[in-house]
A protein has these predicted regions:
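Alpha-helix termination/capping residues and helix-transition junctions
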Residues: 14, 169-171, 232
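Bacterial Sec-dependent N-terminal signal peptides
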Residues: 1-27
Length: 337
């Protein structure tokens, strides 16, 4: 079974469970929309136990705290603000409430983290004669180290693209894959890229699916495997560069790569976002999106809230002033050892 099929199997289960559940009907009133949102999260959000352990989240207490703020005559804008504040209690940057006029989101997960990326400085490394293979930009640095920048996994990464890219970089003594500021995209593209860095089937993580409405109703962890590509594969050291804006499918890419031989993760903690998403709609048409099926790395550690690098590095002001990227320079040193 391919890793893609194995990874997406729980989505079907989640959908089946949702379709078989009794659907509660709520009035399209401030109170009805509040009740609908609180219950949707209560029955489907998958990190309550983790959050309770981390900082003592009590979702029942949150209900009573915010119910007092709901009034029959409150405006749509006022209701949106209260519901957004209630979702903030989850402290989860991957929980969003969508309305026609705005999107409620929790941005504090970025706080305390430097940008650790500069497009202006990146030009210094890519130059003007770098090559482009669909979603990849690549070049060879002066010290004979290959460099690939992957700005997004929304752009197709085909097998032919990877053949050409890796063939051109085959003379290099090592490779840097930069996924900083990559907000994700199509997981299959991330898997296609990762499959070029292992010679065998590798366990890369686990996933659980919802089995009921209680906060702890999850299946036993099911393994996720990455199948090795049957085409040109890389056999030399690799450094993957990350920052807090590496999330969603990129977070999964980092999770996979850290399980592979010869790979070192360098930079800052990723932004997370590996849990399988679930969407639902409120009576007034607003929609909410959050993680409903938790995923873990190969050591059964949560990856939803970010993956720590093997070597933590921050860009320094001194290097910035000299047009240097501290994280890239560190990766070059690691490969050059």
């Amino acid at each position: 079974m391919s890793v893609r099929k194995l990874f997406h199997f729980p989505i079907v289960l989640c959908a089946m469970l949702a379709s078989c559940s009794k659907i509660e009907v709520y009035d399209n009133t401030p109170k009805g929309n509040f009740e609908a949102l609180w219950n949707i999260i209560d029955e489907r959000y998958c990190f309550f136990d983790y959050k309770a352990e981390e900082y003592g989240l009590d979702w029942d207490a949150v209900y009573h705290q915010y119910k007092r703020k709901i009034a029959d005559d409150m405006s749509s804008t006022g209701l949106f603000e209260v519901l957004g504040d209630m979702l903030d209690e989850l402290r989860d940057g991957h929980v969003n409430l969508y309305a026609a006029h705005d999107v409620a989101r929790y941005w504090n997960f970025h706080e305390g983290y430097a940008a650790n990326f500069s497009e202006e400085i990146l030009v210094h490394y890519l130059g003007t004669d770098y090559k482009i293979a669909s979603g990849l930009r690549y070049t060879i640095l002066p010290d004979n180290i290959g460099y690939i920048y992957v700005p997004s996994f929304s752009n197709s990464i085909g097998e032919g693209n990877l053949d050409e890219c890796l063939h051109a970089l085959a003379i290099c003594r090592g490779l840097i894959i930069d996924v900083r500021d990559n907000g994700g995209g199509n997981l299959s593209y991330a898997e296609t890229l990762a499959a070029r860095f292992t010679n065998e089937r590798v366990l890369t993580g686990y996933i659980c699916h919802t089995t009921g409405k209680e906060h702890s109703d999850f299946s036993s962890p099911e393994p996720i495997y990455l199948e090795s590509s049957d085409r040109l594969r890389w056999q030399k050291p690799v450094c993957v560069l990350t920052n807090r804006s590496s999330y969603s499918a990129t977070n999964d890419f980092v999770k996979i790569m850290r399980s592979l031989p010869l790979v070192t993760i360098v930079g800052d903690r990723t932004g997370g976002g590996s849990g399988l998403p679930f969407s639902s709609e409120l009576p007034n048409g607003w929609s909410v999106r959050f993680s409903a099926c938790p995923s873990f790395d190969a050591d059964m550690r949560h990856t939803e809230f970010g993956i720590a690098p093997d070597i933590h590095v921050e860009m320094t002001d001194e290097d910035r002033s000299r047009g240097l990227d501290t994280i890239i320079e560190t990766a070059r040193q690691i490969i050059g050892q």
